[in-house]
Swiss-Prot record:
Protein name as it appears in the record: ATP synthase epsilon chain, chloroplastic
Protein encoded by which gene: atpE
Membrane topology field: Peripheral membrane protein
Any GO molecular function: ATP binding
Any one of the GO CC terms: proton-transporting ATP synthase complex
Species whose genome carries this gene: Daucus carota
Amino acid sequence: MTLNLCVLTPNRTVWNSKVNEIILSTNSGQIGVLPNHASVATAVDIGILKIRLDGQWLTMALMGGFAIIGNNEITVLVNDAEKGSDIDSQEAQQTLEIAEANFRKAEGKRQKIEANLALRRARTRVETINAIS
């Protein structure tokens, strides 16, 4: 038995196909979803989506949103998403270094919040590449 996973951003469909299992980063921690999972709606945190497909694990960086799970259908609506295989490792590392520098020199509450958010996004992209090695 499989699940149908659909990952959507405001601009595109990132994923729409059958999967065996997922592990999703939510605001209250990670949840694993197998076929016949209980229906749930949950907030999605900035984090890694792990997808098991035909015995292999794939990863995707998710940039926050929400997910609806029910009747073996998973719909994930996020601000942005990127497959781990599509992320350029060198570019992601450079972005992380810039985000870390910006976080260190951020002044004022708003600037610190924005720098922290950019840092979390950059870390997630790097971690997505390294998650299933």
